[in-house]
């Protein structure tokens, strides 16, 4: 799970917290005192209670055993630091104390404890009492239980296969199903309407941590030039606090001895993250309960994507086996390898001067491999994948709608608050057109226009830099091909082991793919920082807006970075090369690359294999080894105190912090993989299989990291997968075009079909029946050696003997023809067939896609009914409760009125 270092995030802070400013103290009335003078002289200053560790390592409570720890703040005691440069420590202490004082003023309760292993560290435990939870639950529009849900779930559709699905499902005796409730946004004045059996259990730990984090993110601690500074994120980034996190509930390897601990972390590790559970379904409800909806929806999506990949992988393997089993029947490959056909065809040099003439049969092995991938099965698989991706997206929408209902996120958009970073910049006052009330915004319409323009320009500039790197790879390919052509063994018979498997084209393709992969990894590191800086400057209002904006920028960068080399090989290489007598030069110096006689499809397959495989290996190294090694190093440094009993908060502190963007990079990794699986699948039918194996491991690796290597994430709400959904839809539409063009222009399928149906028989051919015999000879044009220009004339070798002509891959008239070296009739037939194929394939697949999209509703009828039923019952329940309250109140009022009337009518005593 990739993350950015604290130093990187520090550099991206737009304002430093080292500036002098007024320390801010707040009371419950939100009064801000800007001029406090010396903090030590303030009687209003409040500090957390210091308590010694009580020796209970699994405790999740304050020392009193009653107040639950909802969040932990960690700082290094300034009085015990070794250095104090220019009063920096004193400034940090003042800000921290002001911040903690304001937390107490907001109703939070704090308790401080020194570290057991390092007495410089102080852990501040934060508890939110009932009144604070209720107040902010209403502010945040958090949905809470009204009454148990009495709607019955539909029985399983698998019927007799229940025994099989039961094996794959989570054991309900271990992870008990959560009770479902009707819910509504919490309101304090309707507290009696809610299902409050136990106040301590009404707000679950994830909700408590979410509320506390909301408060921590908005409490002020300093004012500089009338601009407030607030929030725990800024304090952590500036080093005032070393960490801030909610607690895991127990150790992951064994259950807690504390009877009040739910042991959810242990259950997640045992039934989800452990390798022995790799075949089981994910406990999504428990994941959502422990980590929040945002983490839950990611694993739900990844699991569903992986399930759908199973079908694609099966069909892909079938198409691969079809090509593999039929490669011995590949007539054109036999002609390439035949000593009397391919062994006697002299091919023209593919570069100037240094490149030799060569015999066609040295490409025998590559032609055999090409038969596996360039077969009829490839066409079938490309059409299938065009339909598969639509089915996946449509069925995922339905599954997502079910999760929205089950997890109470149907109307989540009403809950989201502005980001603290946005609120801190709101200095301009405008009139809201809807409410006609004053509101603060960070910049005017003109300022917003300038920011958007600058951000768009920056994105465009960096995309151009990526394209420049791709051009550099192309220049490398053009240059190194000449070197390999001159240096590799020149055994023209193709029997030397090196020459047999390592042709100049193959060597160039492999080395260029490896270098391209290395450059991609380097550029990724740079572009991550750039995209975050641009998005921070753009200043989106909500966290969803921020993530969606960053998502689009990162995807644009990654799209160009990962796919540009594949697009070059698929659609540009070998397409604009001219012919030996008049070659086309790149940048006026480098002669354009040519494809093998069988086309560039095998090279595209090689590129995809190296990038997909290398990316998977590199990501696993980053995701598994790095956190494990960092934690191992941390344990090694703490070995001196290993015999001491350490509390839960200190154990969690020594875990790795999650990156600021959470699972953003996990989504990005999977979407890039989704692009490889769909955009170029016509050249590599095994891509879904590789993706399937990777994702099965990815789910468990991510689960293992979250439960064992990382601190607990702050639970967050999420309704869907955000901007990734339209990105996948865009990829799905583009994939139809790319696969149609790969089959038409990159593979040799269309020229073979044209030859088989038109040019193998009269009037163009000499055969009496449709056949592929003679295809190679028909697709290689003749060039007269004497027509070479001095610049491009090849380097002949004595092994070839005397020859006056050579062959090259194109459809042109031979020398001596009235239209010598012009495109012949075969060329125009092939072009017409390619264009017709693209039009037909696109229209057929798009028609099927649109029909499927129309036929499959985004929300199932049953889910719609359940949502409407719950809304109806919720409104009915609230209405009934409201009537009861009204009746009760009216009864009280009526009694008082009757009593007043009686008092007025009663005769006064004389």
Swiss-Prot record:
Reactions catalysed according to its record: a 1,2-diacyl-sn-glycero-3-phospho-L-serine(in) = a 1,2-diacyl-sn-glycero-3-phospho-L-serine(out); a beta-D-galactosyl-(1<->1')-N-acylsphing-4-enine(out) = a beta-D-galactosyl-(1<->1')-N-acylsphing-4-enine(in); a 1,2-diacyl-sn-glycero-3-phosphocholine(in) = a 1,2-diacyl-sn-glycero-3-phosphocholine(out)
Protein name: Anoctamin-6
Positions annotated as glycosylated: 329, 361, 493, 777, 790, 802
Organism expressing this protein natively: Homo sapiens
Induction entry: (Microbial infection) Expression is induced by SARS coronavirus-2/SARS-CoV-2 spike protein.
Cytoplasmic-side segments: 1-300, 397-455, 531-551, 622-663, 706-722, 858-910
Keywords linked to the UniProt accession: Calcium, Cell membrane, Chloride, Chloride channel, Disulfide bond, Glycoprotein, Host-virus interaction, Ion channel, Ion transport, Lipid transport, Membrane, Metal-binding, Transmembrane, Transmembrane helix, Transport, Voltage-gated channel
Primary localisation category: membrane
Pfam families: Anoct_dimer, Anoctamin
Name of the encoding gene: ANO6
